[in-house]
Amino acid sequence: MDIIYNPVLGGVVEGEWPNVHRNYVPTLCMHCKNPECVPCCPTGASQQDPDGVVWVDYKKCMGCKVCVNACPYGMRDTSHMVRRFDEYVRKCTFCKERREMEPDKDPYCVQTCHQKARIFGDIDDPNSAISRLINRSDTFRLLEELGTDPQIYYIPALGGKR
């Protein structure tokens, strides 16, 4: 089973014929500061590292899907492992294993984005490029009203709306 870590919301259609365009919204794990998926895990497999990255320890995961149901963004899924017959939960980890080996490397989704629409960095550093972009007045976060404090920010497309 293939897992899609960055599904795209259908987008918002704007304009009138013949000047119609659609804005697409790629989604991924929001790596919330207050994730609902971490404290509910009965085995402690769902974790959050000191940098705020939410991840799953596959060795501890029993595939109960409690965290799948707890995620308000629907960004967790289960997958059959090749070497095991049971299921475990998978999700975007910002390529945690890769960044542990190569700390100066961005996650693959950032590295391979042809339009350079994805930016990864330290949002706690006020001088970082990502912090400067976040401080723009037009950025927004999905389902911010839930209180999970999502750490993925969106900048509307030029001329686009939220």
Q: Which residues does each PLM region occupy?
A:
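Non-ligating segments of multi-cofactor redox enzymes
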Residues: 1-162
